[in-house]
Amino acid sequence: MTFSEPQKRISSAADVDSFKRSQPYATIISLLDKYSSTVQEHLLPPNEDELAASSKALVTLCRKLSALIDETPPLEGPRRFGNVAVRDWHDKMEAQTTALLTEAFPSINKDSIIELQYYLHGGMGSKQRLDFGTGHELSFMAFVGGLQKLGLLETDLPAPDVLFIFETYFVLVRKLIMTYSLEPAGSHGVWGLDDHSHLPYILGSAQKVSRSVTASTLLVPTKYDKECPPSSVMNPRIVQQQKTTNLYFAAIAFIYDIKSGPFYEHSPILYDISGIATWAKIHSGMIKMYIAEVLGKFPVVQHFYFGSELYPWKDTEGNDLPYSKVEDEEPVKPKLPLGFKSKKEPQTTPHARLPLMGPRGMPMETVERLARRDGQRAAREKEEREDRASGGASGTTGAPGATALPPTRAPGSSVPGGDAPGMAPTKAPWAK
């Protein structure tokens, strides 16, 4: 195997189309399906005692990264966009990555670290943008898949191992988010599924899907739907009970911890999903949503890079895929300063075309227009005062024969819930 540093290959919408025909895309879909089917009817184990040795090693690695957070406290004082101390944490992680991987997996091919470390680092959020989102989760899943491909993790991970590895990771990144106030990456705001995550909802819903379910029985309730229906997420007490054994409920519990107010207001999509009859239908919708909103969105997958072995930029038949080079992209035309023209237009002396400026940087033309308006208003007010003083009814509130104007109010919303007209709520894939 010849490993190489992962490179950017997705720079345009056309590259996303190529990505959908690539080996990495097929691998990621396969991992999602495999992990989902593996964890069906399984609970998150209370500890790692029954895990394979290699799985325990990965769990230990994640916990060491968590300990680094304790060694790197956030900077004091208010911050609007994340705490820059997370960059120090990233620096420490990057400096220790080779040692952490070789300690966890003594048989690792040292050459593979150049590719593996990219997906590990990417799974911890953005060092530059101080954010965390679904693209970072994708990177960590690629890291786990890479370990499997190299034989460092079992190819067929048992359900307890899948659940415990990913829940340990989710606990780690939630700690990162809370400690360093990481922003949501590419969030859809209130109309997104979750500010930061998607994978726990896929794996957690899969846990409550019966193996007897088929494509034609997605809406037929099973014992899992009757024992703990999807609507249970609206009950904080049940959420607390379920979060220790189910990844979906653990993610919901995190939302309850960090958000206040009615659930249907801050998480309307998850609220709508809670009304679906079966977990099988929810899981099916979560997969479709992930494919569309994560794997199919340029802002997310543009940060997924490609090496030569683990995730090569090749199609499923092994052929190299085309990609847009940065220099091929349409350059952004800079805006010309006020008063200047492009080279195609006749150029005059620039300062001769600039407007005369008045107070506070306003053009004198604007200042004069505002002064005229204020003068006209003052004249009208003076005329009204004189009118009232002379006993005129003009402008007198409640005067006989005067018609009262209705109070001004905003036009009614055309969307339930008060959204602006035309801003219909995003429908989930499972919505009919």
UniProtKB/Swiss-Prot annotation:
The encoding gene: RRD1
Bias kind Low complexity: ranges: 396-412
Catalytic activity, as annotated: [protein]-peptidylproline (omega=180) = [protein]-peptidylproline (omega=0)
Gene3D superfamilies membership: 1.20.120.1150
UniProt entry keywords in alphabetical sequence: Cytoplasm, Isomerase, Nucleus, Rotamase
The UniProt record lists the keyword Iron-sulfur: no
Region feature (Disordered): 322-432
Entry's Gene Ontology BP terms: autophagy; DNA repair; G1/S transition of mitotic cell cycle; mitotic spindle organization; regulation of transcription by RNA polymerase II
Enzyme nomenclature, EC number: 5.2.1.8
One Pfam family hit: PTPA
Homology family: Belongs to the PTPA-type PPIase family.
Biased composition annotated in UniProt, kind: Basic and acidic residues: 366-389
GO terms of molecular function: peptidyl-prolyl cis-trans isomerase activity; protein tyrosine phosphatase activator activity
InterPro entries: Phstyr_phstse_ac, PTPA_C_lid, PTPA_sf
Cell compartments where the protein resides: Cytoplasm; Nucleus
Stated name of the protein: Serine/threonine-protein phosphatase 2A activator 1
Predominant subcellular localization, coarse grouping: cytoplasm
The organism's place on the tree of life at top rank: Eukaryota
Function according to Swiss-Prot or TrEMBL: PPIases accelerate the folding of proteins. It catalyzes the cis-trans isomerization of proline imidic peptide bonds in oligopeptides. Acts as a regulatory subunit for PP2A-like phosphatases modulating their activity or substrate specificity, probably by inducing a conformational change in the catalytic subunit, a direct target of the PPIase. Can reactivate inactive phosphatase PP2A-phosphatase methylesterase complexes (PP2Ai) in presence of ATP and Mg(2+) by dissociating the inactive form from the complex.
Gene Ontology cellular component annotations, sorted alphabetically: chromatin; cytoplasm; nucleus; protein phosphatase type 2A complex
Keyword Cytoplasm: yes
